[in-house]
Structure formats: C-alpha cells, structure tokens
Amino acid sequence: MVRKRQPGHAAPAEDVRDDGVRDDGAVDRTTQDPARAPLRADEVRAALLAPVGPLHRCEVVDRVGSTSTELLARLRTDPGWADGGLLTAEHQDAGRGRAGHVWTTPAGAALTLSLAVRPGVPRERWGWLPLLTGLGVARALRSTTGLDAGLKWPNDLLVPAADGTGVPDWGRERKVAGILAEVAPGGEVVVLGIGVNVAQTPAELPVPSATSLVAAGATGVDRTTVLLAVVAEVTGLLARWRAHGGDVAAAGLDAEVAAACRTLGGAVRATLPDGTEVRGTAVRLDADGALVLRAADGSEQPLLAGDVRHVRPVGELGSQV
C-alpha cells in the first residue's frame, strides 16, 4: 500500500523504487549524484526561449512515457508546438528507438528530449535531419564532456570505450546516444527525439555495447549544461541547412557530417528488413543522406536509413567476413 503524504513532506525511503521514481509517480529529487541532479527548468527556459534562444515553446516535465509520443500528441491539438517546440523530461519510461526498440533508463540518469521542427525544404532532403541532429549532439558532447563523440550512420552516437576493450559487432566504441526522427500528422513537421545516456553505471546499462557519459570517463557532467549545448548545436545546424534550402553541399554540411561519421571508410554489413545482408566499404554519403557501400567488385549501392535495420562493422571485433 502506498501511504499518502502531506504536501511539502519528503517521500519516505521505502516509497522510492530502485529506478528513482517514487510510488506516487514523481521523480525522487534527493539524489546525491551531481550527474543525476534535476534539470534547472528556469535556466533552461531562460536560455532557450525567444528572443534570447531559438525556441518558441519549451517545457520540462517530471515524467512521461515518451517525449516524442507526447510531443506528437500535442502537435495534433496545438500548432504552436510546430516549429521550435521542445519537450524534455526528467524521466521517461517508454522511450522509443528505430525498428520499435524500447529505451528505458533510471530516473535522472539520461537526457530525454524531443524537438519539433518544420523543415521547409524539399522532402527528398529530409534524410539529412537525423544526421545533422547527430552532428549537433556529437559537438555538444565533445564541448561539455571532452569525450570523442562521433556518428554511427544513421542515428547513433558513439564514444570510445573507457577501458579500450571491444564488443563484437561494435568494435572499441560504445553507443551513448540515439536519435529518432518522425514525421508528425500533416506531413510538414518532424519530431526529433534525442536520448543521451548520462549517468548510468555499467551495471545499469542494458547491453555491453551501451555506455553513458559517466561510464565512458566524463567527470563533472551536468545534465542542464549538456541539454543547453545539444539544443544550441542542433538548432544552429538546422538553421544553416534551411538557409540553403536543404542543400548540404552548398551549406558545407555534408563535409562536416562526413568528418564526424565513424561509419565511413570502414567495411560494414547492413541488414535489410527482410534479413538480407549487404556488405561493402562505406565510401560516402550521397545527396539525400544515404550511405553508399562499395562491393568487392566495385559496384556501389546506396542505403537509405528507412531501408536498413542494422549497420555493423566487419573485421576485428566486428562481423566475420
């Protein structure tokens, strides 16, 4: 039985679950781990809302199933969220990734945010949205933590393993963040979901290929600082992209994404939805953001993010050729 509390009284220890969420549904804010400290909502709004910042809507909520699911629902009834609307949560318990993957984290241990943008460029250029978002997140993580963050096409962020060890199918890097881009009803707005593992310990991580900023060796991590940097970098890159009509070459963004993309230059295998595997060397990104693989016979095949389930390295600590 859950005991009722008087307003203003702290939750008894037995009313707080191991995931940091109290039995009344709120997030426990008594953590002694600075990396799990609550987001400073007033500071976030002051820095990000216009006219100071790039956003028109910004809300920090305590708990939600999925920030993207919630933002998509809000877009159906309130168009004010449509361009420059940000929803971030202290804790989400039904986060979503590509191919229906579920992403859950302990309360206060991650950054979970969704940003609504109106691309305003030809639809065939929207394939760059997750890549540009990933570049922005990578730059934010580098500047705030010093970790060497890079992109794994099409939507993951990698950092070197703290101990330098390798994991099959991933090599000597670990996934620290992921991105999910979804088109909202009406087809004119895209919701960019961003999840960053911040403070999880190795024991709290779901798979050996995952890490967090703290587990990867970052010290003095502050979630509010990382959040502000992520939004600033992502919105700045998207503004450049839109200013050039979505032409990444004209904006110089194709070269910047390529320089940060760990996938390029390596031998990889791509698994298609029907289970078919395509192998080759990842040689470049084409005009719409597709990954171009060159086979042993010299032929090339572009792969669109929506047509691929997994991309894995081939070779040492990767798949066997």
Predicted regions and their residues:
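N-terminal lobe of the biotin/lipoate ligase/transferase fold
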Residues: 1-143, 163-170, 318-321
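Long, positively charged amphipathic alpha-helical accessory segments at protein N-termini or as interdomain linkers
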Residues: 2-10, 28-36, 123, 127, ...
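Short, basic and Ser/Thr-rich N-terminal targeting/leader segments
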Residues: 54, 81-83, 151-153, 276, ...
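Short beta-strand
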Residues: 60, 149-152
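Residue-level recognition of hydrophobic positions within alpha-helical transmembrane segments
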Residues: 64-66, 152, 229
